[in-house]
Amino acid sequence: MQMAHIGTDIIEIARIRKAIETHNQRMLNKIFTKKEQEYCLRLTNPYPSFAARFAGKEAVAKALGTGIGKVIGWKDIEILTSPKQPKVHLPPRVYKELGISKVLLSISHSREYATAMAVALV
């Protein structure tokens, strides 16, 4: 039987918008990969997508049981868009060190909030 660890997060889109407007490229480069930035910045309103990816990274880190910090950094968790569901890319060392076989992620947003739920399969 395969074990699963879950993580969830919710964030106000306005909070991410304010952080991006205040810190601009420095904040984007600290949190988001180049591919994530390219995807979000193509959109008319990028803030909900940035917030959903931020929540996704938090949810993944919680599911991994590490949080963001020493074991895994913001940009180690890359969330890319695919037709069926978001794809989570992690460094191979993370899978090996934590004994994770796969990470599944669901992200969503409303007008005010972005939310995410991650499942890490062991």
From Swiss-Prot:
- Keyword Cytoplasm among UniProt keywords: yes
- The first-level EC class reads transferase
Recorded hits in SUPFAM superfamilies, A to Z, give: 4'-phosphopantetheinyl transferase (SSF56214)
Q: Name the Pfam families for this protein.
A: ACPS
Q: Which UniProt keywords apply?
A: Cytoplasm, Fatty acid biosynthesis, Fatty acid metabolism, Lipid biosynthesis, Lipid metabolism, Magnesium, Metal-binding, Transferase
Cofactor (UniProt)? Mg(2+)
**What GO cellular component is one of the record's annotations?**
cytoplasm
Show the GO MF annotations: holo-[acyl-carrier-protein] synthase activity; magnesium ion binding
Q: Does the keyword Cell membrane apply?
A: no
Subcellular localization(s) per the UniProt record: Cytoplasm
Chain sites annotated for binding Mg(2+): D9, E58
Q: Where are the disulfide bridges?
A: none
InterPro entries, A to Z: 4-PPantetheinyl_Trfase_dom, 4-PPantetheinyl_Trfase_dom_sf, ACPS, Ppantetheine-prot_Trfase_dom
Q: Which reaction does it catalyse?
A: apo-[ACP] + CoA = holo-[ACP] + adenosine 3',5'-bisphosphate + H(+)
What does the record give as EC number? 2.7.8.7
Q: Name one GO biological process term.
A: fatty acid biosynthetic process
Q: What does this protein do?
A: Transfers the 4'-phosphopantetheine moiety from coenzyme A to a Ser of acyl-carrier-protein.
Its family remark reads:
Belongs to the P-Pant transferase superfamily. AcpS family.
Name under which the protein is recorded: Holo-[acyl-carrier-protein] synthase
